[in-house]
């Protein structure tokens, strides 16, 4: 039981960092397109 807990936490952390990366790319794309079209 104690062995599967850190594994699950690592997967959850990886998924969270992936979502943050996608959010960061989305924000940068919006700022970049607004900079271009201005």
Swiss-Prot record:
Cellular compartments annotated: Plastid, Chloroplast thylakoid membrane
Organism: Pleurastrum terricola
Predominant subcellular localization, coarse grouping: plastid
GO biological process annotation, one example: photosynthesis
Subunit structure: PSII is composed of 1 copy each of membrane proteins PsbA, PsbB, PsbC, PsbD, PsbE, PsbF, PsbH, PsbI, PsbJ, PsbK, PsbL, PsbM, PsbT, PsbX, PsbY, PsbZ, Psb30/Ycf12, at least 3 peripheral proteins of the oxygen-evolving complex and a large number of cofactors. It forms dimeric complexes.
UniProt entry keywords in alphabetical sequence: Chloroplast, Membrane, Photosynthesis, Photosystem II, Plastid, Reaction center, Thylakoid, Transmembrane, Transmembrane helix
InterPro entries: PSII_PsbL, PSII_PsbL_sf
Entry's transmembrane regions: 17-37
HAMAP family: PSII_PsbL
Pfam families: PsbL
Function of the protein: One of the components of the core complex of photosystem II (PSII). PSII is a light-driven water:plastoquinone oxidoreductase that uses light energy to abstract electrons from H(2)O, generating O(2) and a proton gradient subsequently used for ATP formation. It consists of a core antenna complex that captures photons, and an electron transfer chain that converts photonic excitation into a charge separation. This subunit is found at the monomer-monomer interface and is required for correct PSII assembly and/or dimerization.
GO cellular component: chloroplast thylakoid membrane; photosystem II reaction center
Name of this protein: Photosystem II reaction center protein L
Family as reported in the entry's similarity comment: Belongs to the PsbL family.
Encoding gene per record: psbL
Source species taxonomy: Eukaryota, Viridiplantae, Chlorophyta, core chlorophytes, Chlorophyceae
Membrane-related topology note: Single-pass membrane protein
Entry keyword annotation includes Thylakoid: yes
Domain of life where this protein originates: Eukaryota
